[in-house]
Amino acid sequence: MKKQRIVVKIGSSSLTNSKGSIDEAKIREHVQAISVLKKAGHEMILITSGAVAAGFSSLGYPSRPVTIKGKQAAAAVGQTLLMQQYMNQFKQYSLTPGQILLTRNDFSKRERYRNAYATIMELLERGVIPIINENDSTSVEELTFGDNDMLSALVSGLIHADQLMILTDINGLYDANPNENPEAKRFDYLPEITPELLGYAGSAGSKVGTGGMKSKLLATQTALSLGVKVFIGTGSGEQKLADILDGRGDGTYIGDKELSSVNNTRQWIQFHSPISGEIIIDAGAEEAMIHNGSSLLPAGVVGVNGSFPKGAVVEVRGPGGVIGKGQTHYSSEEIMEAKGKRSDELDFEKTFEVIHRNDWVNVKD
């Protein structure tokens, strides 16, 4: 089997005991399974929850705190304890982990987005196992990922992973709640995530985590759109990840084998960039951009809403509504000066595209 880049996401419920505290035996087993694939030549990246679960009891909380300040305090203590556990376990296999804590700003700010990519790739190049978690001790409620399921999908896309393995306490996706309906049927394979499947999943999560099955499916949708196949399920023993990789996992495999990776510029535009304004285009430009993959030229621009600098990301609206978003080559003032004009009517420096097709993401097909 060729070397693969694999992201493993482990949720709180797969790391904790019945009291909600970190279970050292569970961490040991996860590390063993990761080490098996690492020793086989694969690149391994771990997205781990558990900082809050690891720290809340040390602060005197009887259970997982629900307030932001409580979670942040627990995470500040717990992240150190959690990382110490991982370091001790990986040391048994002569492997070195490296900690990366991310927030929304690390994705929405273009330079930080590039830096996150460069750091992870350097760690992989050096044979280190990146251990990634949201920076729960500094994130504010409005800026959090909501759960590490989505973080795992975004990281998988960022580094162009071959597969995302989401480990949970349920062995895959069912057409009904298996805890309530003994007739519930498991899906062993799904080509995609549909609205109907999201309805099956519901929204409830476990008492120690923040992500239910629905959040995992939303993350899966994102991963698939970025060209990453997904497995959702469970397993036991040091061979569990190897079994998943070989198609023998206890869960649901999601995604077509022919998925195409998405370059980082388009990923950033599609999922992370702030929207600074809007460009209005005519029907001809709409047709060319949606169906022909064309760049946006000044001749197709009708108007501009908002004030924005060169390099801003804006939505593009045609007669049929918003058709996508892209990064502009000119400021709003320059676009207004050039709108509706043919190339031979413009100064030389303004004959280039308003939005190049490589800096463009369709939201309509």
From Swiss-Prot:
One GO MF term attached to the UniProt entry: RNA binding
The EC number(s) this enzyme carries: 2.7.2.11
Highest taxon listed in the record's lineage: Bacteria
SUPFAM superfamilies in the record: Carbamate kinase-like, PUA domain-like
Keyword Iron: no
Residue ranges of domain PUA in the record: 276-353
Alphabetized UniProt keyword annotations: Amino-acid biosynthesis, ATP-binding, Cytoplasm, Kinase, Nucleotide-binding, Proline biosynthesis, Transferase
Secretion signal, residue range per the UniProt entry: none
Gene3D superfamilies named among the record's database cross-references: Acetylglutamate kinase-like (3.40.1160.10), PUA domain (2.30.130.10)
Binding annotation for ATP: K9, T168, D169, T210, G211, G212, M213, K214, S215, K216
Record's subcellular location: Cytoplasm
Pathway info: Amino-acid biosynthesis; L-proline biosynthesis; L-glutamate 5-semialdehyde from L-glutamate: step 1/2
Reactions catalysed according to its record: L-glutamate + ATP = L-glutamyl 5-phosphate + ADP
Residues holding substrate: S49, D136, N148
Cross-referenced NCBIfam families: proB (TIGR01027)
Biological role stated in the UniProt entry: Catalyzes the transfer of a phosphate group to glutamate to form L-glutamate 5-phosphate.
PANTHER family: GLUTAMATE 5-KINASE, ISOPENTENYL PHOSPHATE KINASE
Family as reported in the entry's similarity comment: Belongs to the glutamate 5-kinase family.
Record-given protein name: Glutamate 5-kinase 1
Organism the protein comes from: Bacillus subtilis (strain 168)
Gene: proB
